[in-house]
């Protein structure tokens, strides 16, 4: 075995990629014209193994199996491409400027300046969380940055160019977002960034499954080429795209999503990103203890932001049609969700029940309290005239684009 190791050391450099779980080779010499065009680093394949065995056999008889044992052993040092990239960047200092803010300005989000600043804030958290998940196997970036806008707006292209060229091969596009397969689970440990397209075409069940995948701490699956199941850390961060603004339909909450509607996006081909500046800043913030997760107040603000992206739910509409919250000194009345369901006529509706109605009342901010083991909600019933006036105000609001003079 020592002879094989010496032969390899004289001719090639090798490293074991901890992300792909494959050995890579860099040639110190070539063995003919057919190998002169090999890139600097190449994943070992049958042809390369056969070439090494052929050249080694010229010096002494050797079994292919012995060569494979050495290549698959700890003789080959381990290498983590993401950590190697980050740890070899030039250090970032505040004097160099806010490169992540500059990156955020390449995406012109719809809305006022506050919305643009919010995008910059969320992008920074998301990027630092992505770096944290690359550096620490215990960290999972469990929120998805989503860009919503028309086709041809560079949404997927922007995400595809977000990884630096040295890591570009670890970007994965999921075009059939409606299915999450075993192979998709394995990609969580094999890619640094996964882009899920057409999120707006996914059903609630599919979105919930995707949300569960986003929060998985590790993956215990057997790769096609492996002999054993392995517990692999969740490496991938998530991004997504869609065309329709209203795509969130989860009544249990939307804090896993960071959606923004875009007006336009600068082409990353015409205006390349400052990768070293962006990632050296994100890495520095991570090492400085920057809080990339959302606290309670930030989650509340995120939930308010996400309301514009939620699909209309009939239980919300029914409650808003028949009830409102007390104003001023109004006492209102405390009713259980089951009674409210009867009053709005929901007992004859297939997709509405008391549980959904209770969640909707809570989400809409109605006060509640427990009485004799039953949760009751403080509501005011709209009179017939008030219901008519409420409909008229809604129509005016729609016709004016949401602005009432």
Q: What does each of the following model-derived ranges do?
A:
Residues 74-189:
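P-loop NTPase catalytic core of nucleic-acid-dependent motor ATPases
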Residues 192-214, 248-253:
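Conserved AAA+/SF3 P-loop NTPase catalytic/coupling segment centered on the Walker-B
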Residues 248-267:
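A short helix-turn-beta junction within AAA+ P-loop NTPase domains corresponding to the substrate/partner-engaging
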Residues 208-230:
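Conserved catalytic/switch belt of AAA+ P-loop NTPases
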Residues 1-95, 114-117, 348, 390-405:
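N-terminal nucleic-acid engagement/recognition segments and initiation subdomains in replication
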Residues 264-275, 332-405:
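Positively charged interface segments
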Residues 184-189, 223-241:
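AAA+/SF3 P-loop NTPase mechanochemical coupling elements
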Residues 288-331:
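Conserved alpha/beta core segments of nucleic-acid transaction machinery
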């Amino acid at each position: 075995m020592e002879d094989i190791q010496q032969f390899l050391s004289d001719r090639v450099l090798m490293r074991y990629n901890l992300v792909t779980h494959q050995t890579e080779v860099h040639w110190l010499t070539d063995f003919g014209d057919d190998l002169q065009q090999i890139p600097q680093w190449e994943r070992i394949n049958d042809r390369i193994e056969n070439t090494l065995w052929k050249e080694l056999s010229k010096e002494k008889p050797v079994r292919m199996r012995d060569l494979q044992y050495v290549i698959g052993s700890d003789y080959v040092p381990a290498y983590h491409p993401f950590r190697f990239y980050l740890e070899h960047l030039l250090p970032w200092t505040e004097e160099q400027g806010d490169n992540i803010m500059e990156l955020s300005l390449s995406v012109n989000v719809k809305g006022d300046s506050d919305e643009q600043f919010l995008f910059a804030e969320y992008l920074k958290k998301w990027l630092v969380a992505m770096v944290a998940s690359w550096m620490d196997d215990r960290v999972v970036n469990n929120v998805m940055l989503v860009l919503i806008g028309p086709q041809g707006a560079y949404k997927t292209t922007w995400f595809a160019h977000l990884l630096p060229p040295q890591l570009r091969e670890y970007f994965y596009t999921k075009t059939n977002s409606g299915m999450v397969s075993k192979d998709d689970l394995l990609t969580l440990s094999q890619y640094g960034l996964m882009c899920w397209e057409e999120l707006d075409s996914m059903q609630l069940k599919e979105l919930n499954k995707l949300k569960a995948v986003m929060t998985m701490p590790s993956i215990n699956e057997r790769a096609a080429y492996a002999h054993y199941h392995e517990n692999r850390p969740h490496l991938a961060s998530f991004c997504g795209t869609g065309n329709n603004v209203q795509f969130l339909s989860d009544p249990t909450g939307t804090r896993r999503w960071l959606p923004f509607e875009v007006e336009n996006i600068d082409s990353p081909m015409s205006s390349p990103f400052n990768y070293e500046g962006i990632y050296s800043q994100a890495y520095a913030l991570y090492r400085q203890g920057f809080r990339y997760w959302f606290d309670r107040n930030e989650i509340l603000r995120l939930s308010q932001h996400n309301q514009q992206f939620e699909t209309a739910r009939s239980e919300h509409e029914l409650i808003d049609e028949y009830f409102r919250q007390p104003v001023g000194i109004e006492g209102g009345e405390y009713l259980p969700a089951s009674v409210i369901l009867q009053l709005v006529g929901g007992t004859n509706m297939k997709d509405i029940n008391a549980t959904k109605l209770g969640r909707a009342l809570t989400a809409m901010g109605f006060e509640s309290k427990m009485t004799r083991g039953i949760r009751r909600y403080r509501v005011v019933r709209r009179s017939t005239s008030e219901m008519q006036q409420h409909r008229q105000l809604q129509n005016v609001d729609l016709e004016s684009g949401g602005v009432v003079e």
